[in-house]
Amino acid sequence: MFFGGEGSLTYTLVIICFLTLRLSASQNCLKKSLEDVVIDIQSSLSKGIRGNEPVYTSTQEDCINSCCSTKNISGDKACNLMIFDTRKTARQPNCYLFFCPNEEACPLKPAKGLMSYRIITDFPSLTRNLPSQELPQEDSLLHGQFSQAVTPLAHHHTDYSKPTDISWRDTLSQKFGSSDHLEKLFKMDEASAQLLAYKEKGHSQSSQFSSDQEIAHLLPENVSALPATVAVASPHTTSATPKPATLLPTNASVTPSGTSQPQLATTAPPVTTVTSQPPTTLISTVFTRAAATLQAMATTAVLTTTFQAPTDSKGSLETIPFTEISNLTLNTGNVYNPTALSMSNVESSTMNKTASWEGREASPGSSSQGSVPENQYGLPFEKWLLIGSLLFGVLFLVIGLVLLGRILSESLRRKRYSRLDYLINGIYVDI
């Protein structure tokens, strides 16, 4: 009876010692859980990863404790990475123990049903110098490979990392400092990420605002009026006076047709038409049976104005809506008959302004120069479009002819029949 009680007491003491060792090992073993990830074996074997044969453990804690107590991987290597397979049942090996020489030697990839744990206590640190921010050694140990501020791989794997163990913060605070320091590290990481996102957002908004400003500045500069037309197009309201600047004879009239196609959502420019009145001061230019077409293309509006001169015996009369211009010459590439407009010096006392430009003078040279690149770039595009359409048409025609010829050749080819064919045909005829 005494020996039986002594044996049971010894057995109880052994169990208590074993449980104490396991509890102490699990408490001193600092770990980081990574859910639904597994080691990329193909790329890790060439980087020095080592492992033992898989063993069976009933729970994840047993597998973690086994990794913490294993010091003989490939001789004298300590386990610092373990994977627990939750899909294995019926006492199948589900605990995999590995030794990683450094963080880069063990890249991970997503895998459902697998729990990976890094043993941070014995895991060698890897310090990186980033161009945007520099993290201390404690921060690199804290975040490991899956931190967004330490390694580029973190950006791809942070979606799979879900830390489940909270008890490691106390141990880490005992090793690296107080909990306040850890909170500062966490806040610094989050603040830096938010600052980068805010800077990126602000940069996009500033670039958009600058582009809007450029478009707004281009609006008054690129709007050009045609000096050889009667219709005046301007972003400001123009008022017609009872006595226009240029007066036409009663037997001649000019009908301008202006078509504005704004590319942006802007207000349509007003058009002021000058009517004919009895001439008081003859200030006009005489065109001899000529028709000219001017195209003014701007970034904000496309103004196409076509004017024709009536076939009168005295010729057509055209007016210029400017007051003080001595000599004006239009040279455009699209006009077949270049027209030179010459005017005599006009005294301001004998004229009234028809349109008020408010400090803006239209430049015909700029409109002609602006239309040249459009034509230069527009013609090759249309040319290549026509060539491509022609090639596709020819290709489809050739394919159709080939298929048609094949069908015709097969229909005209005489089929050779064997004796069996004749026998079968005779049987069908008899039936």
From Swiss-Prot:
InterPro entries registered for this protein in UniProt: MANSC_dom, MANSC_N
Domain MANSC: 33-117
Transmembrane residue ranges: 386-408
Gene Ontology terms: cellular component: Golgi apparatus; membrane
Compositional bias annotation for Polar residues: 248-261
Membrane topology value: Single-pass type I membrane protein
Tissues where this protein is expressed: Widely expressed.
Name of the protein in its database record: MANSC domain-containing protein 1
